[in-house]
C-alpha cells in the first residue's frame, strides 16, 4: 500500500496551545489564536497516512478524505487555515458539494495553487438532467476549475428522486454526457440513513458508478438489516472496483435540546482522545474503506493524527464502553430519525 509522508507543519499553521486560544469563531467552526508556537499534532515529518486506489479511477487517494462541508459557513481566512491543515496533514482528496454553503467558493483560492495535488469531488442534488447539468456548471465556476475528478449524485435515497435521476433525461444520463465532454472524470452516488446501502445496490444495478458514500460506524452496524445491506454492498463494490467512502465515523448522537456546546456539525461528534481514535480505527481497520472527515473542523487535526499508519479494529467491549460512557445513540433509526 502506497503511503504519503506528512510534510512538516508550516509556520502559518502554528498556534498557541488549546488552553490559551482566546476565542472561537462561531461561524467558522475553527479556533483562532496567536500563530506563533508549533501546531499541537502535525509535527513529526515521519508520520504517514496510507493511500490506496480510489476504485478504478486511477488515483491513489489518502484513506482520509477532507470533507469540505466544514468550510460551508467559514470566512475565507478561517477556511485558508483549515486547508493549510489539510495540506500539512498529507491529504490528497477533497470532497465538497454544491449544497455545502460557500464551501466551493472557499476552496477556489486554494485550488488555484494546489489543484494538481488533489483529487477533487463535488456533488449535485439535481435529479433531472437539466438541473444536474446547471449545478455542475455552477460548481465548476465556483471552484475555478475546468474539470472535477468526481461528480456525485447527492443523497439519492428517496425512491421517486431515484427514478427521476435514473430515467431518460435524468441526472445520471446528464453526468455521463458531462464525463464524455471532459467536465468530470468519474461519477458516484452518496446518501444518508438506514436505507442507503440498499439504494446504492439498486443504483449499481442500473449504472456503473465509480464510487459510493454512506454512513459507517459501530452503532449504525448494530442495526442487523443495515449491516447485512452494507456487507452486500461492500462485496459488490470489491468485485467491481467501486470506491467506498464513509461518513459519520466519529458521530456520538444527535444534538440534545439542552446542549450548550458549539454546533459545528448537525450531529454531536465524539470527543477528542480515545473515543475519537476508536471511531477512526473502526473504519480504517477495514482496508476497503475511505473515511471522510467531519464538518466540525475543530476535530480535523485529531482525526488526521488518529489516522496515521495501520489500524486494528477496537474490540466490541471497548466501543460498547464508549457507547455507555458517552450515552451514544444512532443518528438514523429507520423511522423518526431517518432524515438529517
Annotated model-derived regions:
Residues 143-162:
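Active-site groove signature of glycoside hydrolases
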Residues 102, 156-340:
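Beta/alpha (TIM)-barrel catalytic core signal, keyed to glycine-rich beta->alpha loops juxtaposed to Asp/Glu
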Residues 54, 66, 94, 107, ...:
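Conserved, mostly hydrophobic/aromatic
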Residues 41-118, 174:
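N-terminal binding-site loop/beta-alpha segment at the start of enzyme catalytic domains
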Residues 67-77, 122-130, 265-271:
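Active-site mouth loops of central-metabolism enzymes
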Residues 15-17, 25:
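Intrinsic-disorder-associated, low-complexity terminal segments enriched in Asp/Asn/His/Tyr and depleted
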Residues 74-86, 130-143, 195-203, 276-279:
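Short, acidic/polar
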Amino acid at each position: 500500500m502506497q503511503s504519503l509522508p506528512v510534510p512538516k507543519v508550516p509556520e502559518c499553521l502554528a498556534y498557541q496551545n488549546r488552553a490559551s486560544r482566546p476565542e472561537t469563531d462561531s461561524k467558522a467552526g475553527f479556533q483562532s489564536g496567536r500563530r506563533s508556537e508549533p501546531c499541537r499534532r502535525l509535527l513529526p515529518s515521519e508520520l504517514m497516512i496510507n493511500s490506496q486506489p480510489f476504485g478504478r479511477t486511477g488515483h491513489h487517494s489518502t484513506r482520509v478524505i477532507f470533507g469540505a462541508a466544514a468550510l460551508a459557513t467559514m470566512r475565507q481566512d478561517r477556511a485558508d487555515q483549515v486547508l493549510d491543515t489539510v495540506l500539512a496533514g498529507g491529504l490528497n482528496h477533497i470532497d465538497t458539494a454544491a449544497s455545502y454553503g460557500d464551501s466551493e467558493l472557499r476552496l477556489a483560492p486554494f485550488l488555484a495553487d494546489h489543484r494538481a495535488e488533489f483529487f477533487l469531488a463535488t456533488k449535485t442534488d439535481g435529479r433531472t438532467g437539466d438541473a444536474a447539468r446547471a449545478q455542475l456548471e455552477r460548481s465548476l465556476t465556483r471552484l475555478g476549475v475546468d474539470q472535477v475528478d468526481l461528480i456525485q449524485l447527492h443523497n439519492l435515497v428517496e425512491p421517486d428522486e431515484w427514478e427521476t435521476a435514473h430515467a431518460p433525461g435524468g441526472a445520471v444520463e446528464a453526468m455521463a454526457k458531462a464525463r464524455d465532454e471532459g467536465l468530470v472524470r468519474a461519477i458516484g452516488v452518496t446518501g444518508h440513513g438506514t436505507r442507503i446501502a440498499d439504494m446504492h445496490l439498486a443504483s449499481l444495478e442500473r449504472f456503473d458508478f465509480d464510487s459510493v458514500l454512506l454512513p459507517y460506524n459501530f452503532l449504525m452496524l448494530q442495526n442487523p438489516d443495515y449491516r447485512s445491506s452494507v456487507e452486500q454492498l461492500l462485496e459488490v463494490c470489491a468485485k467491481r472496483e467501486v470506491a467506498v467512502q464513509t461518513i459519520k465515523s466519529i458521530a456520538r448522537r444527535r444534538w440534545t435540546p439542552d446542549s450548550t456546546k458549539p454546533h459545528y456539525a448537525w450531529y454531536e461528534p465524539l470527543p477528542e482522545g480515545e473515543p475519537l481514535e476508536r471511531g477512526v480505527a473502526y473504519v480504517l481497520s477495514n482496508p476497503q474503506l475511505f473515511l471522510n472527515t467531519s464538518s466540525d473542523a475543530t476535530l480535523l487535526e485529531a482525526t488526521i493524527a488518529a489516522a496515521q499508519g495501520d489500524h486494528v479494529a477496537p474490540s466490541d467491549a471497548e466501543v460498547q464502553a464508549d457507547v455507555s460512557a458517552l450515552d451514544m445513540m444512532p443518528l438514523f433509526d429507520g423511522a423518526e430519525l431517518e432524515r438529517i
